[in-house]
């Protein structure tokens, strides 16, 4: 019987370790740094109020949003889906430029963005403006996931 090449053994070990590590990683919130900055600029609520809100403002799907604010996040997710399927964008890892006047509903995505960056920026812009007009219900923050079936 032939001995296994040490380099192959090393690669096999690395793959096994990475698979074991990946299986223990809990689902992560979406990479939404620019969206967080838009919220921070236009709203006096803290970002943490919107993380883990309802069914759509977290990394889970649902049949029905729990309220208007959750509908804003549902629309953003649908916009991101369109960005991927129609435009080939990667909205969860994409950085873009935008301008904002602090605590105003004046957000501008027209900077020197590519078509994808501009599209994703406008997904976040629309969601941010929607959130500004939606009522925040603290009972929908950190809700039981069973409500999102």
UniProtKB/Swiss-Prot annotation:
Chief place of localization: secreted
Disulphide linkage map: 41-100, 55-148, 57-73, 72-130, 79-123, 89-116, 109-121
Compartment annotation: Secreted
Signal peptide coordinates: 1-30
Tissues of expression: Expressed by the venom gland.
Entries under Gene3D superfamilies matching the protein: Phospholipase A2 domain
BP term (GO), one: phospholipid metabolic process
PROSITE patterns, per database record: PA2_ASP
Matching InterPro entries: PLipase_A2, PLipase_A2_Asp_AS, PLipase_A2_dom, PLipase_A2_dom_sf
Gene Ontology CC, one term: extracellular region
Keywords: Disulfide bond, Ion channel impairing toxin, Proton-gated sodium channel impairing toxin, Secreted, Signal, Toxin
Family annotation (Pfam families): Phospholip_A2_1
Domain notes from UniProt: The toxin-channel complex has a triskelion-like shape with one toxin heterodimer radiating from each ASIC1 subunit. Toxin subunits protrude from the edges of the channel trimer, with each heterodimer interacting almost exclusively with a single subunit.
Family membership: Belongs to the phospholipase A2 family. Group I subfamily. K49 sub-subfamily.
Remaining remarks: Negative results: the heterodimeric toxin does not affect ASIC2b, ASIC4, Kv2.1/KCNB1, Cav3.3/CACNA1I, ENaC alpha/beta/gamma (SCNN1A/SCNN1B/SCNN1G), TRPA1, TRPV1, TRPV3, TRPM8, P2X2/P2RX2, and 5-HT3/HTR3A channels.
Function text: Heterodimer: MitTx, a heteromeric complex between Kunitz- and phospholipase-A2-like proteins, potently, persistently and selectively activates rat and chicken acid-sensing ion channel ASIC1. Both alternatively spliced rat isoforms ASIC1a and ASIC1b are activated, with a higher potency for ASIC1a (EC(50)=9.4 nM) vs ASIC1b (EC(50)=23 nM). The rat ASIC3 subtype is also sensitive to the heterodimer, but with a lower potency (EC(50)=830 nM).
Record's protein name: Basic phospholipase A2 homolog MitTx-beta
Protein species of origin: Micrurus tener tener (Texas coral snake)
